[in-house]
Amino acid sequence: MDYNVSAGSETYRGFLMDNILHSDVGDIHFHLYIPESYDKSEPYALYLSLPGYEGLYFQGVGTNIRSEDFAFEAQKYNDKMIIAAPQLSDWGNTSAEQTIALTEYLLDAYAIDRGKVYINGYSGGGETLSLVLTKRPELFTAALHVASVWDGELAPLVQARTPVYFVIGESDEYYGSARISRTYEELCRLYRAEGLTEEEIGALAVLDVKDRAWFGGGNQHGGIGRVSQDETVMRWLFGR
């Protein structure tokens, strides 16, 4: 398939900035990190990081990776991984379709190990992630859903068996933790209805509600971003 891509001209901490995939669902702005060792002779892992509101494109080029560390911390877990940090335009269906289009482009354009395709979404990016995993859960090996809620459906996720790690502060100032806790409980119920054991469910769905002490008394919705430095969480994602 032919793709129309405008390459960026500036770099930031190893990322080629503001590439544009001109797609049927609009122009998709994204920053791209390709390890120097990549030469197409060996399939690499792929990771996409969906930003919160502060990282959307209208906030300015690069605000996503200047305010969130997921794309940089990920490099510590696999030195053979291509990383894309899209700057989306909203946290709804448009951004979900654009995330899927970008993923499909990257899978076609680069030598990617289809068994190592990861994604995370923080805040509004988590809402987008829930829609992505409703539409095309089979594209991804595992997902990290950070400080957000689930706007999508769960049945497609159950059918695809895509593992999801939900993490949020117990008193998240924007979303609270009750809604995503209910989502997790419903997801587990659906897996039980499919006949899965508790051990099997535990490998597919994790709920990690951080207490006040974890934040040191500070802001929880913004402070949750430091899970990008939490080895337990990140190894769960990239160990799949």
Label the predicted regions.
Residues 1-46, 127, 131-132, 191-205, ...:
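A domain-start/cap signature at the N-terminus of enzymes
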Residues 37-42, 91-123:
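Gly/Ser-rich "nucleophile elbow"/oxyanion-hole loop immediately N-terminal to the catalytic nucleophile
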Residues 42-43, 57-63, 96-97, 131-132, ...:
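Short, solvent-exposed loop/turn and secondary-structure capping segments
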Residues 52-56, 88-93, 123-127, 148-152, ...:
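Solvent-exposed loop/turn segments at secondary-structure junctions
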Residues 108-109, 115-159:
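Primarily recognizes the serine-hydrolase "nucleophile elbow" in alpha/beta-hydrolase
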Residues 165-167, 173-175, 181, 190-240:
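C-terminal catalytic histidine-bearing segment of alpha/beta-hydrolase fold enzymes
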